[in-house]
């Protein structure tokens, strides 16, 4: 079975392993290069970590289909990060990014992010161990959550904001699932 293909499968639950009764190909993904495949793997691993097996979740399925379809036409790094942001929202793990998680005051401008508390920390509540969370990275998070995979509109991304948001989200996810993401090691090996 080709990775990231859309399939219609009939599975039967076994004691230790499921068995496949039938499998029909619905669609193959666009041809992917190694970079696109690596980012698709990150999306798949995060999805597996944040969702329950054997629980149908149509909204997550549609998100994954949309992400795979645009990976080859758009910046795969941004597509993957957008898909992860959307997954966090759909699975109830979305970080708080509009108000301080300590004092609940609205935050405008640069702030910090607490991986442990799962959200924004204002300057007054900053304890020293939080990650920097610039206003640009906050805005990028909002844009990635709102990105329409069916009709992606162009927007400008500063490299520093992208790297900061990636660091925040990947650390947050690793903290939530309590294990490293192997696909991130693969990205690092590729120099991505």
PLM feature segments, named:
Residues 1-192:
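Non-catalytic alpha-helical scaffolds and adjoining flexible linkers that form interface surfaces
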């Amino acid at each position: 079975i080709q990775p990231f293909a859309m399939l219609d499968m009939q599975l039967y639950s076994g004691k230790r392993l499921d068995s496949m009764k039938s499998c029909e190909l619905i669609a193959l993904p666009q041809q992917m290069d190694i970079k696109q495949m690596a980012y698709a793997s990150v999306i798949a691993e995060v999805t597996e970590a944040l969702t329950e097996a054997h629980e149908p979740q149509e909204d997550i399925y549609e998100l994954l289909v949309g992400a795979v379809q645009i990976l080859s036409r758009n910046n795969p790094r941004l597509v993957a990060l957008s898909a992860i942001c959307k997954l966090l929202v759909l699975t109830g793990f979305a970080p708080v990014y509009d108000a301080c998680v300590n004092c609940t005051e609205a935050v405008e401008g640069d702030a910090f992010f607490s991986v442990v508390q799962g959200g924004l920390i204002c300057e007054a509540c900053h304890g020293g161990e939080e990650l920097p969370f610039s206003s640009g990275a906050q805005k990028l998070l909002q844009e990635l959550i709102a990105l329409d995979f069916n009709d992606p509109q162009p927007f400008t991304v500063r490299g520093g904001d992208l790297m900061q948001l990636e660091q925040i989200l990947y650390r947050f996810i690793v903290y939530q699932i309590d294990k490293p993401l192997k696909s991130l090691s693969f990205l690092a090996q590729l120099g991505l």
